[in-house]
Amino acid sequence: MPLWILKMTKITKLNKKNFFIVLLPLSILLSLVFNPIKVNAEIAETEINGELMNASIEFLRDLDFETWQLVTYKSPLAEDKLILRVIGYPGNLRIDHPTNLQVDSGRKRWFLSDKTLLNVDLANDRRQAAAEFDLDELINNIDKNRPLRLSLSGVFSELPVPPFVVKEWRSLS
């Protein structure tokens, strides 16, 4: 066999070896980039107002990088309506009541009524770092898990809520 044919087969074997060494990690990387791991929200049994109930609990940051806890649950105090509790860190703010929560999604806008004073535990809490809102109207008016923006006058100007959280809220209703 001529020498040039032997050299050619050696080069093609090297190319095949390098091809698989480079191609396999590259294909794995591309599959992770274009098919990201899904983030699933969780509904857990939580103690709220002294009772165990299913609730969605998420920590989100507003555009000022302040962290807020959003707890959504069906309240036995409010005729089993879906309630959204917004909790800030005590000492950082004071939420005056009643204050409606503005919710925006695209061109649509909702104002959720403040239900904080109906909850005796929150009404008597001196820290005043939490507020509760009637989420039923919003959940009944949306048919998709769309991203939302929450605004609470004097507290935060915009708190983005991702679609997976909205999906979790809708599953509670």
Residue positions per predicted region:
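Low-complexity, acidic Ser/Thr/Pro/Gly-rich terminal tails and inter-domain linkers that flank the onset
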Residues: E42-L77
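Short, surface-exposed binding/anchoring microloops in extracellular/periplasmic proteins
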Residues: D64-Q102
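Short, solvent-exposed, Trp/other aromatic-anchored flexible loops in extracytoplasmic proteins
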Residues: G106-F156
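Bacterial N-terminal signal peptides that target proteins for export
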Residues: W4-L24
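Short beta-strand elements
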Residues: P160-S173
